From Swiss-Prot:
Quaternary structure (record): Interacts with nop5. Component of box C/D small ribonucleoprotein (sRNP) particles that contain rpl7ae, FlpA and nop5, plus a guide RNA.
EC number(s) from the headed UniProt entry: 2.1.1.-
GO biological process: box C/D sno(s)RNA 3'-end processing; tRNA processing
Lineage: superkingdom: Archaea
Annotated gene: flpA
SUPFAM superfamilies: S-adenosyl-L-methionine-dependent methyltransferases
Function of the molecule: Involved in pre-rRNA and tRNA processing. Utilizes the methyl donor S-adenosyl-L-methionine to catalyze the site-specific 2'-hydroxyl methylation of ribose moieties in rRNA and tRNA. Site specificity is provided by a guide RNA that base pairs with the substrate. Methylation occurs at a characteristic distance from the sequence involved in base pairing with the guide RNA.
Keywords recorded for this protein, A-Z: Methyltransferase, RNA-binding, rRNA processing, Transferase, tRNA processing
GO molecular function, one term: RNA binding
Source species taxonomy: Archaea, Methanobacteriati, Methanobacteriota, Methanomada group, Methanococci
Protein name: Fibrillarin-like rRNA/tRNA 2'-O-methyltransferase
Length: 230
């Protein structure tokens, strides 16, 4: 068994040191022995950790790249927009641990993959729906502490504001992975990031952190905001 050093960097999120100088992060396994996307399982003091691959998770990439504000923690209720097959939502569920994570995905085929890989995480609630239409899933999703968005649409920022108005508690947090090329392939990414930030601020957010997630994802920026409403 590999000898590793584990250190908590955020609540329920850890750095793992294999002694090779590489930066790695992990979460405690909510379902020990269960992999979601082929991730490595490691052990320290009889606790199992899932190594979090930043090449497959924009939130993981942001943490590796120096994210300072991490609002997701134990007991945090989360709405995750753009769940895909469940890679990042599974780590978010590990962190939230005792509270619910609503995971929204638009594509039925991908949602089936998500359910197959994450069905043992009892705090992870699959929701099939369109992030542009929060009213359609308002009978399922309760008020949440954090919204995380990873939706590759031209109106990414507007989608976040729309969902915040429906579901985010006052002074709750939102995290959004902005994909510049999904907004406009003709513009400089920095210009797009500035435009998206302006939409978020005008929509009711105070931006408190920004992290570029290259080289893990090209032309992506993670932004963290506090919801002040409007």
């Amino acid at each position: 068994m590999e000898k590793i050093k584990v250190r908590e960097i955020f609540n329920n999120a850890y750095s793992v040191d294999f002694g090779d100088g590489l930066k790695r992060i992990a979460t405690k396994s909510l379902v020990p022995g269960k992999r979601v996307y082929g991730e490595k399982l490691v052990y320290s003091d009889n606790i199992e950790y899932r190594v979090w691959n930043p090449n497959k998770s924009k939130l993981g990439a942001a943490i590796i790249n120096g994210l300072k504000k991490m609002p997701i923690k134990k007991g945090t209720k989360v709405l995750y927009l753009g769940a895909s097959a469940g890679t990042t939502p599974s780590h978010v569920a590990d962190i939230a641990e005792t509270s619910l994570v609503y995971a929204l995905e638009f594509a039925p085929r991908i949602m089936r993959e998500f359910i197959d890989s994450c069905n043992e995480r009892k705090n992870l609630i699959p929701v099939l729906g369109d992030a542009n239409r929060p009213q359609d899933y308002s009978n399922i999703v309760e008020k949440v502490d954090v919204i995380f968005e990873d939706v590759a649409q031209p109106n990414q920022a507007e989608i976040l504001v729309k969902n915040a108005k429906w579901f985010l508690k006052e002074n709750g947090y939102a995290m959004i992975s902005i994909k510049a090329r999904s907004v406009d392939v003709t513009k400089n990414p920095r210009e797009i990031f500035a435009e998206q930030k302006k939409i978020l601020i005008e929509g009711g957010f105070e931006i408190v952190d920004e992290v570029n997630i290259e080289p893990f994802e090209k032309d992506h920026m993670m932004m963290v905001g506090i919801w002040k409403g409007n």
